[in-house]
């Protein structure tokens, strides 16, 4: 009876751990050493503060086999239910300012902006694309599955592949690397637990051609 009771207790523990890991989106719970906790959850909108300002260097393919380079400045101002957000998008020839409201729950734009749609598309398909992957809070735990990409042939998982101390323009950052591989090259997004947006990304298409890459250049935080 003692042996049977001990086996049941062990089985119960294993089942509970598996349930927790499953809720965190783990492909292989048995290989996950760290049990996910609430403080491991991250979302792209939860750590923004009034007055936070970020500057990025963005390189993006324009679809014509050419590469465009931009400086992207993002300033957040607090408002009820939304962040009043100012984007300044600059390249060698011009600078464009866009003022909009982003939802505090998922960074979606409150209203569509027809006038500056070209630049909105640039933002949505690069730095702000994380909102389409992390539609709800996700675990910053190695092995956690965040989403998947359907190529028509394969269903490619997007998951946390590693933890990395990243040297950046704003200092050394502890980051988690969100990765997926459509062909041969791995697409990676570096996320710091205490920042509301990724600090670096390098993304490739199904032909291993660069879609976009960006790095954070500076940040000015207003944590009270």
Question: Could you describe each region identified by the protein language model?
Answer:
Residues 113-142:
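Acidic/charged, solvent-exposed loop-and-adjacent secondary-structure segments enriched in E/D, K/R, S/T
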Residues 10-106, 140-224:
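Acidic, serine/threonine-rich low-complexity disordered tracts
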Residues 1-5:
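Short, low-complexity patches enriched in S/T/P/G
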């Amino acid at each position: 009876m003692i042996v049977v009771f001990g086996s049941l207790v062990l089985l119960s523990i294993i089942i509970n751990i598996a349930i927790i890991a499953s809720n965190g989106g783990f492909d292989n719970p048995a290989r996950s050493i760290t049990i996910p906790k609430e403080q491991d959850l991250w979302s792209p909108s939860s750590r923004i503060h009034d007055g936070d300002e970020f500057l990025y260097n963005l390189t993006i393919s324009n679809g014509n086999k050419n590469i465009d380079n931009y400086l992207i400045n993002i300033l957040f101002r607090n408002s009820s239910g939304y962040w009043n957000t100012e984007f300044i998008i600059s390249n060698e020839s011009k600078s464009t300012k866009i003022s909009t409201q982003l939802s505090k729950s998922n960074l979606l734009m409150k209203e569509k902006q027809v006038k500056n749609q070209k630049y909105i598309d640039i933002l949505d398909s690069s730095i702000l694309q994380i909102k389409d992957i992390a539609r709800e809070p996700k675990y910053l735990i190695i092995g956690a599955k965040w989403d998947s990409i359907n190529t028509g042939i394969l269903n490619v998982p997007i998951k946390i592949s590693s933890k990395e101390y990243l040297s950046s323009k704003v200092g050394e950052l502890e980051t988690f690397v969100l990765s997926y591989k459509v062909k041969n090259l791995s697409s990676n997004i570096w996320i710091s637990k205490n920042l509301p947006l990724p600090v670096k990304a390098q993304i490739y298409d199904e032909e291993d051609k660069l879609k976009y890459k960006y790095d954070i250049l500076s940040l000015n935080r207003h944590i009270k």
